[in-house]
Amino acid sequence: MVGVDAGGTASRAVVATVNGQVTGRGRAGPGNPFAAGPAAARAIADALRQALAGHDPAAVAGGVLGLAGTGACLDPAITAALGEAWAAAGLTCPYEIVGDAVTAFAAGTGEPSGAVLIAGTGAVAAEIKDHAIVRTADGLGWLLGDEGSGHWLGMRALRSAVHTWPSPFAARIATRTGAADRDRLISWAQGLPHARIAALAPVVCEAARAGDPHARTIVAEAVGHLTATLDAVAGSGPIVLAGSLLTAATPIRDGVRSALQERGITPLTSGDPSIAAAWLAVARLPAGDQAALHAAFFDAGALA
């Protein structure tokens, strides 16, 4: 089976046996068709070719592709490009496209239903039922939402820096951006270098860890936004935290986990979504202990 995680930062692919042994991996450029357009399909094809090296593509029985921006598949040109990417890797088997929230959830639990909160460059929460997205909250992009995300943290940091200049926090932000003074920082921000704005998130987290009051205020706001986003979709079932801000050791993760634990909820942490995609492909088969199979996939994947 083949599993693909096609995100806004990178495309990752794995080849795995039906028993959960990962036998091939690949990584290429961004696979989000909204952000990368037709180049996303080429990146997916590159990741697949790398993962399939040394394998016979004809032996692959099926696959699942977890895709950021699945609405792009309403575009016939993008749908055709994804099919061409599959074929370019030598694959002739059927495949299913699911939202990346589905693979992120499945990377944290073998249960079919629950909720997932993702916070990386963007932020979104989704209710999952039988490995399908039922409803979402936020995920609206940097202009309209993504509250508590890496990009949101960066924008909030810039606003704080220009309003508190020349505070120590403003100095941290200016140093990272290379701005020599407040006017240059304003000019830098107005250019909207989105990737570099999101890259300010670690600066905020580091400053919050060091006790900076401005950074701690921003982190507290982010935690509040993210828990509210999750509350909009969470029901019964496990809650999985995904995305770099919630899986790495950040004050955002600590704050969200603490807020949930105060309610008696112990969230799970998402693992590799490309492995989850491969597991989902196998889980579509009619037989087998899915919980045991999930454990096998992630135990094997961790060692591969």
Regions found by a protein language model. Give the residues of each.
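A short glycine/serine-rich beta->alpha loop
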Residues: 32-34, 69-70, 139-147, 264-268
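Fold-independent oxyanion-binding glycine-rich loops
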Residues: 6-7, 67-68, 99-101, 119-121, ...
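Glycine-rich beta-strand-to-loop/alpha-helix junction loops that act as flexible
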Residues: 64-71, 119-121, 236-249
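Active-site nucleophile and cofactor-binding loops and adjacent substrate-binding regions
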Residues: 95-103, 118-119, 266-275
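Glycine/charged-rich beta-loop-alpha catalytic/anionic-binding loops adjacent to active sites
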Residues: 83-91, 132-141, 257-265
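Short beta-strand-loop/turn "lid" adjacent to the catalytic site in phosphate-handling enzymes
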Residues: 27-33, 49-89, 96-97, 106-110
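Glycine-rich phosphate-binding loop of actin/hexokinase-like ATP-binding domains
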Residues: 112-163
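ATP-binding/phosphotransfer module of carbohydrate and carboxylate kinases, centering on a glycine-rich
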Residues: 1-59, 107-114, 158-304
